[in-house]
């Protein structure tokens, strides 16, 4: 194989790998996806069935936008309404998940 073609292949592989590594998650994204997304939705909008069953509003709802990060943290940590308290997460993980969720709108 000519040297130029081999160099182009190596370069394209290196660029592909580098771009895959650069797509990093925010600190709370993995936690949100694992622990919150099933109810609150991937984009912060719950499915119609989940919204009705659990009385969940989308992150874009004015009532949700009006909540502070501390209020959301407390709701996650202690539970609120039909949402049970989050267990097995540190305060930092809950705060990171809240920050990620608030950024979805």
PLM regions: where:
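C-terminal capping alpha-helices of c-type cytochrome domains
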Residues: 75-76, 87-105
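Electron-transfer interface patches adjacent to heme c in soluble/periplasmic c-type cytochromes
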Residues: 57-70, 85-93
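Bacterial N-terminal signal peptides that target proteins for export
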Residues: 1-12
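Periplasmic/extracellular electron-transfer cofactor-ligation site
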Residues: 29-55, 78-84, 103-105
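Mature, folded catalytic cores of secreted/periplasmic enzymes
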Residues: 14, 39, 61-65, 95-98, ...
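Electrostatic cytochrome c docking/interface patches
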Residues: 15-31, 47-48
């Amino acid at each position: 194989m000519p040297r130029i073609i081999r160099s182009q292949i190596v370069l394209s592989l290196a660029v592909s790998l580098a771009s895959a590594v650069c797509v990093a998650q925010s600190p709370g994204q993995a936690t949100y996806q694992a622990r919150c997304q099933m109810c609150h939705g991937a984009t912060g909008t719950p499915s119609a069935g989940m919204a009705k069953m659990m009385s969940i509003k989308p992150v874009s709802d004015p009532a949700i936008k009006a909540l502070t990060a501390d209020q959301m943290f407390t709701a996650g940590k202690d539970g609120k309404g039909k949402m049970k308290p989050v267990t097995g997460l540190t305060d930092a993980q809950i705060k990171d998940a809240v920050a990620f969720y608030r950024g979805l709108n």
